[in-house]
Amino acid sequence: MFSFVQRFQNVSNQAFSMGIVMVVFIMASSYYQLINNNAFSVPSNIDNVKTLINVRTSRYFGSQRGKAKENMKIKFDLNTDLTPLFNWNTKQVFVYLTAEYNSTEKITSEVTFWDKIIKSKDDAVIDVNDLRSKYSIWDIEDGKFEGKDLVFKLHWNVQPWVGLLTYGETVGNYTLTVENKNKV
């Protein structure tokens, strides 16, 4: 007959194997639900973006050796419905607004202006006007934003209870050319 240790090992191996199978099933079914809900083609409307540029000499705002740097914040309108990102395995959704721009000839920079954690499906509809960005950004290369084209996009990250993180971005973006007159 089998000893107690062999029986315990047999039962624990069975439980572990079944646990792995359940986790894989949960991951696959929740990803399938995201595809079924068209989560990868959620529309967003980013509008009315206004830049607020300050010149700062503090090292907390990117200045080095007392040389002034332009710091930019924005005001924007955002309208999107992120309810397709929620299913039974969604713990929370992390949403963030980014801007891409060419800092030098061959380098594209991407910076984050705003983010939010959405914990329930009830809060998944975002409709805000004249919202001020959470973060102030500066360009590391030359420190000037004027004349640069910024392409704003809304990204999301689904954080599940079980499984891998799922990343994506909404459909719709906003392009803005920074002008010199917006300095504060």
Curated annotation (Swiss-Prot):
UniProt superkingdom: Eukaryota
Residues glycosylated per entry: 102, 173
Record keyword Cytoplasm present: no
Ranges per topology, Cytoplasmic: 1-14
Residue intervals passing through the bilayer: 15-35
GO cellular component, one term: endoplasmic reticulum
Protein name per Swiss-Prot or TrEMBL: Signal peptidase complex subunit 3
Family: Belongs to the SPCS3 family.
Pfam families: SPC22
Subunit record text: Component of the signal peptidase complex (SPC) composed of a catalytic subunit SEC11 and three accessory subunits SPC1, SPC2 and SPC3. The complex induces a local thinning of the ER membrane which is used to measure the length of the signal peptide (SP) h-region of protein substrates. This ensures the selectivity of the complex towards h-regions shorter than 18-20 amino acids. Interacts with SEC11. SPC associates with the translocon complex.
Other information: Present with 6840 molecules/cell in log phase SD medium.
Species of the source: Saccharomyces cerevisiae (strain ATCC 204508 / S288c)
UniProt KW keywords: Endoplasmic reticulum, Glycoprotein, Membrane, Signal-anchor, Transmembrane, Transmembrane helix
Record-level GO BP terms: protein targeting to ER; signal peptide processing
Locations listed in the record: Endoplasmic reticulum membrane
UniProt key word Transport: no
Task of the protein: Essential component of the signal peptidase complex (SPC) which catalyzes the cleavage of N-terminal signal sequences from nascent proteins as they are translocated into the lumen of the endoplasmic reticulum. Essential for the SPC catalytic activity, possibly by stabilizing and positioning the active center of the complex close to the lumenal surface. Essential for viability.
Membrane topology annotation: Single-pass type II membrane protein
Lumenal face of the membrane: 36-184
